[in-house]
Swiss-Prot record:
Family: Belongs to the dCTP deaminase family.
Catalytic EC class: hydrolase
Name recorded for this polypeptide: dCTP deaminase, dUMP-forming
Keyword Nucleotide-binding: yes
Catalytic residue list: E129
Pathway per the UniProt entry: Pyrimidine metabolism; dUMP biosynthesis; dUMP from dCTP: step 1/1
Compositional bias (Polar residues): 171-190
CDD domains assigned to the protein according to its UniProt record, in alphabetical order: trimeric_dUTPase
Pfam families: DCD
Keywords for the protein's UniProt record, in alphabetical order: Hydrolase, Nucleotide metabolism, Nucleotide-binding
Subunit organization: Homotrimer.
EC number: 3.5.4.30
Length: 190
């Protein structure tokens, strides 16, 4: 069940749904707008010949932070990682779904490639997979509305929520745009 504005406010007021910093003006009829943080991860295309999800490639991306008052310019065809300004914390019986903003989509900005789902138990900043499919550069301003977070109530609390040892939660507690940790899926224990 998708939570309405009144249910979202009730969960936040009760302290079960964490959104920090919280601005009540960002609550929509069935979502909460989230804003863009000031850090971005850009891909270094001169260090590696290819991306291998099975290998740890620490120098694949670099952290970039525009100067105060300056935007980040996302060029046509470019893909970077960003993150929400808000720290999101979900209880064991709520899940989230990040969607883009229609107004930005109409300009050619994609907010996430595949990872729009947030598991119950997650706590951290949501990493954004930002792509410019327009034929002109798009300026991304820190603090701008970048997406909307929908919250879904589970039929029962998750038995093993995100963050529990059994799940292997690679991104619990992440701060800022966090690079892929897919290589951890290939590690075999002996």
């Amino acid at each position: 069940m998708l939570l309405s504005d009144r249910d979202l406010r009730a969960e936040i007021t009760a302290g079960r749904l964490g959104i920090e910093p919280f601005d009540d003006a960002l609550v929509q009829p069935s979502s909460v707008d989230v804003r863009l943080d000031c850090m971005f991860r850009v891909f270094n295309n001169t260090r590696y010949t290819h991306i291998d999800p099975a290998k740890q490639q620490d120098e694949l991306t670099s952290l970039v932070e525009p100067q105060d008052g300056e935007p980040f310019v996302l060029h046509p065809g470019e893909f970077v990682l960003g993150s929400t300004l808000e720290l999101i914390t979900l209880p064991d019986d709520l899940a989230g779904r990040l969607e883009g903003k229609s107004s930005l989509g109409r300009l050619g900005l994609l907010t996430h490639s595949t990872a729009g789902f947030i598991d119950p138990g997650f706590s951290g900043h949501i990493t954004l997979e930002l792509s410019n499919v327009a034929n002109l550069p798009i300026t991304l301003w820190p603090g701008m509305k970048i997406g909307q977070l929908c919250i879904l109530r589970l039929t029962s609390p998750a038995e093993h929520p995100y963050g529990s040892t059994r799940v292997g939660s690679k991104y619990q507690g992440q701060r800022g745009p966090t690079p892929s940790r897919s290589y951890q899926n290939f590690i075999t224990s002996t």
